[in-house]
Amino acid sequence: MSDIAIIVSLLSLVAVLGLWIGHIKIKGVGLGIGGVLFGGIIISHCTHLYGIELDAHTLHFIQEFGLILFVYSIGIQVGPGFFASLRQSGLKLNGFAVMIVGLSGILVALIHKLFDVPLPVILGIFSGAVTNTPSLGAGQQVLTELGGDNITAVMGMSYAIAYPFGIIGILLSMWLIRIIFKVNIDKEAQEFDNNQNQQKEGLDTLNVRLTNPNLGGLKLKEIPDFESHTVIYSRLKRNDQLIVPNVDTVLNVGDVLHLVGEKATLHKMQLILGEEADVSVSTRGTIFRSERAVVTNENVFGKKIRHLMLKGKYEVVISRLNRAGVELIPNGEMALQFGDVLNLVGRQEDIETVRAIIGDAHQKLQQVQMLPIFVGIGLGVLLGSLPLYIPGFPVALKLGLAGGPLVVALILARIGSIGKLYWFMPPSANLALREIGIVLFLSVVGLKAGANFLDTLLSPEGLAWMGYGAIITFIPLIVTGFVARIYGKMNYLSLCGLLSGAMTDPPALAFANEIKDGHGAAALSYATVYPLVMFLRIILPQLLAILLWTAS
């Protein structure tokens, strides 16, 4: 067999063995994708015994390309919600998540200095202790540029030694917080639900009868504060006739308007217009329909809603717009993106015409456009290679192959589309790309680390590494957990999701979800902190590597 054939065969064997190990669960907890690392270590131990040598350059390429695929697909997945998570309700959760990341970084620096732990070892322990594989890749890259030798093998070993307690430590932290604070799970779930209902700001509807005599005879656009209030006037009922109004529709006293918007804004408009009306303005039994359509026509990507002139040409109103799972109030200045779901109100024939304009080709939502993927990866690699020179640093700071594609993917996913290129990826395709990338990366890391892993693990040095990893895992979680619970008054279920998200650990999230079956509190906080934490976990080891290298 050729060298390439041998490497591909061994990688396949590592993936099969590692994924099987990852599926083994003890009381519902397993290694997950981390099992691939241990599969690589086992196969590497065997190849070392039989004297099989693998081409280092080929392995290095596979490792780096796998990392690029993984972080890029992560960025595309979380990009639409990344910037939103930094606002309002997400600030508190992200603040505590940053606290966990920051404390772990401080502990790394202290352990490195106090116990004279080699930099590659402590960075590998750090990545394993926080169960974050991209941070391992980021640390390996920057240390290689700094001139370190045998980086991959040493960091891979220390990562693997610290990884198991990285998972166990999160679960232990959740359990201790629950015991110490005597948490009542049912009560916590009820309090969370009550709080969510009070804070919920989704779109609401309201029927208002025009009783203000000063507005009779005015056009819709002449209503006081018409432009300043983000309200959609989707239907108007006059006597028994239902019409779709536009800005030039003349209002009569007694008209019933169907409004869509946020509850507080609807209340303000009711005070201006008149009184709430208990009248049905349903399209049933009329010539009008209310239907959903998805934007898939590349000719309308980036076009503002007002440029389509749907009201003027077709008497169709967009009453709601759903983008990446978030309901938005459409306005004329809003640009359409691929995958936007529009709620259309109008005559059936007009709606069909609008469908043809915006596309509404659901099969396109399942198709993967390959060109934008490679455009994004290429731009990410270029960004990651750009040097940022800081006085006093021995090397230029770079985002690297882990940070560059991540940042570009976050930005492109937020933008959505440029011309005919769109960065929407079906969830199944994104998951497949992400899993392939991480399996390739971990397989190679395991193959490089496995030769001396067992000897290191059983040595006093290996036991010390496990201890350092336990400290880096446990102390930030338990300290932040106590602070969030005592001073932040955080709900326990949300706290469990926060701890899981701060360690970017899906097995821990699965455990947190099982604390209260069918409850979404943990998953919600996990999703809120995950994007920012993933970014910080990739940047932090690079900063630590440069700062500690400079200080030594």
Swiss-Prot record:
Coiled coil: none annotated. SUPFAM superfamilies: TrkA C-terminal domain-like. Keywords: Cell membrane, Membrane, Repeat, Transmembrane, Transmembrane helix, Transport. The chain crosses the membrane at residues 4-24, 29-49, 65-85, 95-115, 161-181, 370-390, 402-424, 438-458, 463-483, 492-512, 529-549. Residues 190-275, 277-360 form the RCK C-terminal domain. It is a multi-pass membrane protein. Its main location: membrane. The keyword Repressor does not apply. One of its GO terms (molecular function) is monoatomic cation transmembrane transporter activity. InterPro entries: AAE_transporter (IPR050144), RCK_C (IPR006037), RCK_C_sf (IPR036721), Transpt_YidE_put (IPR023018), YidE_YbjL (IPR006512). Pfam families: Asp-Al_Ex, TrkA_C. GO terms for cellular component: plasma membrane. PANTHER family: K(+)_H(+) ANTIPORTER SUBUNIT KHTT, TRANSPORT PROTEIN YIDE-RELATED. This is Putative transport protein APP7_1021. It comes from Actinobacillus pleuropneumoniae serotype 7 (strain AP76). The lineage of its organism: Bacteria, Pseudomonadati, Pseudomonadota, Gammaproteobacteria, Pasteurellales.
